Amino acid sequence: MKLLHYGWSHPRNKESIMISCIKFNIEYEYTDVLDRIHTYDYNILWLPCNWISPDSVAKHIKIIYGPHFCVFPTSDMPIVGPLNEDWKERCFFTCMSDWNVNIYKDFVDSFKVPILALPFGLDTDKFCPDKSEKIYDFLVVFKGRNRNELQYSIDVLQSMNMKFHILMWGSFHHEEYLNLLRKSKGVLWIGTHESQGFAVQEALSCNIPLLVWNVKSLFQEVNSEGIPEYRDYIGKKDLIATTVTSWDSICGEVFYEAEELIDTLQIFVNKLTTYSPRKFVLKNLTHEICFGNMLKKLNIQLEAS
C-alpha cells in the first residue's frame, strides 16, 4: 500500500499524514511533479490544495482532497458542483470540523465529492504528560482577538493571585509551546476559529485542561489594527464557528462573554484535578483513529500496527 502526496500542505497536516502512514504500514511519497501522478504504483492520492479530477487518474486510485483549497468556496471552483455518484465511493474532501462543513455548504450548494469533517491525527507520543514542575497556574494563549479581552483576562488573573505566562500567537516556536504547556496547570485560550486546532488539541494531549474563551463566529478575529478580518461578510453571512472543534466536559470549561470569565475560572480551578483531557484525545484524535476513519471512508480495510 502506498500514498502519494502531491502539492503544498500545511506542515502539521503533512506531518500527521506521514506518521499515520507509518502507523498503518503505508509507504509515503511526496511529489511536486504533476506527471508523477500518472505512474500508478500507488493506491491513495492526497491532494491538499489542488483539484485533479478523479476521471484523470486510474479508477483504482483513492483520493483525499483538502483541507487547503480555500477559506470560502465559490461557484467557479472546479470541485464545486452536483455530487458525482461515480466518484463518491473513492474520494472525499475533508474540512476537518463540522462548523467548517456548514460554512462551506452556506456558500455553495454542493461539492462534486463528499465533503466530510475528518480531522487529522495528533502526535500523542510527542504531546504527552511528563513530570515537569508546574510553575504557572495558567499558560495564556492569545490569537487574533480584541486586545481588550486579553487585558481583561490579565486583570482577572492578577486579582486572583494567579501565576501565568502569556504566549502571543506567531511569536513562539513549537518546542517553546510544548515546554510551557508542561510547566502549566492549565491553559487559558483566547483565540479565534479553528478548522481543527492542532495547538488546542496538543494541550489536551499533554493532559493540560483548557479554559477556553470561545468564539461564536469568524467576525471575532481581528487584524493587528483591531479590525475584523471578515468584515466584508457582516450582514451577509453568519459565519458561525468555534475555537474547539473536538470537545468534551472532561477537557475543561468553555465560556463566551467577558462577564462569564470570573465564575467560569473559579469553576475551572475547583475542578482542575477532575479533568482528563488526554483520555478524550486518546479516544478520538490519535493517528490510528483519525487516519483509520479516512481509510474507512475510502473502503480500505487496514489495521494500525
What are these regions (language model features)?
Residues 103, 120-177:
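Conserved catalytic-core segment of nucleotide-activated headgroup transferases in glycan assembly
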Residues 209-212, 232-235:
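Short hydrophobic beta-strand element within catalytic cores of glycosyltransferases
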Residues 182-195, 216:
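Acidic donor-binding loop of glycosyltransferase active sites
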Residues 90-112, 147-149:
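A short, active-site helix/loop in glycosyltransferases that binds the activated sugar's phosphate group
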Residues 249-302:
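A charged, aromatic-enriched C-terminal amphipathic alpha-helix characteristic of glycosyltransferases
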Residues 44-50, 56-77, 94:
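Active-site proximal beta-strand in glycosyltransferases
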Residues 178, 201-205, 219, 224-226:
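Short alpha-helical segment that forms part of, or immediately flanks, the ligand-binding pocket
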Residues 1-56, 292-305:
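N-terminal pre-catalytic "stem/leader" segment of glycosyltransferase-like enzymes
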